[in-house]
């Protein structure tokens, strides 16, 4: 098990730009020791025959094919515009 000292906690806090009150240093020291103890347990697991992965769950591409469908004619769409100029929508100038 990795032993964490209060100076280690102060150093990590400094690197993270955290201001820790002195009365909380001991609490964080104990918590970090528990976390690293858990990591040590994970290191003991045999992963020799486990294939590497990038995700916990297999991701399947569920997208459909992008098919072009004509629902309205160009003329129908242009006729719905409040302002039209030839084959274009006329919109207010924005500047």
Curated annotation (Swiss-Prot):
The keyword Hydrolase does not apply. Its EC number is 6.3.5.-. It catalyses: L-glutamyl-tRNA(Gln) + L-glutamine + ATP + H2O = L-glutaminyl-tRNA(Gln) + L-glutamate + ADP + phosphate + H(+); L-aspartyl-tRNA(Asn) + L-glutamine + ATP + H2O = L-asparaginyl-tRNA(Asn) + L-glutamate + ADP + phosphate + 2 H(+). One of its GO terms (molecular function) is glutaminyl-tRNA synthase (glutamine-hydrolyzing) activity. GO terms for biological process: glutaminyl-tRNAGln biosynthesis via transamidation; regulation of translational fidelity; translation. InterPro entries: Asp/Glu-ADT_sf_sub_c, GatC. Heterotrimer of A, B and C subunits. NCBIfam families: gatC. Belongs to the GatC family. This is Aspartyl/glutamyl-tRNA(Asn/Gln) amidotransferase subunit C. The gene is gatC.
């Amino acid at each position: 098990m990795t032993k964490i000292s209060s100076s280690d906690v102060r150093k990590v806090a400094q690197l993270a730009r955290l201001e820790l009150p002195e009365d909380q240093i001991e609490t964080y020291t104990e918590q970090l020791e528990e976390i690293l103890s858990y990591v040590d347990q994970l290191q003991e697991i045999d992963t020799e025959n486990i294939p590497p992965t990038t995700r916990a769950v297999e991701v399947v591409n569920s997208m459909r094919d992008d098919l072009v469908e004509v629902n309205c004619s160009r003329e129908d769409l242009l006729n719905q515009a409040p302002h039209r100029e030839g084959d274009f929508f006329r919109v207010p100038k924005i500047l």
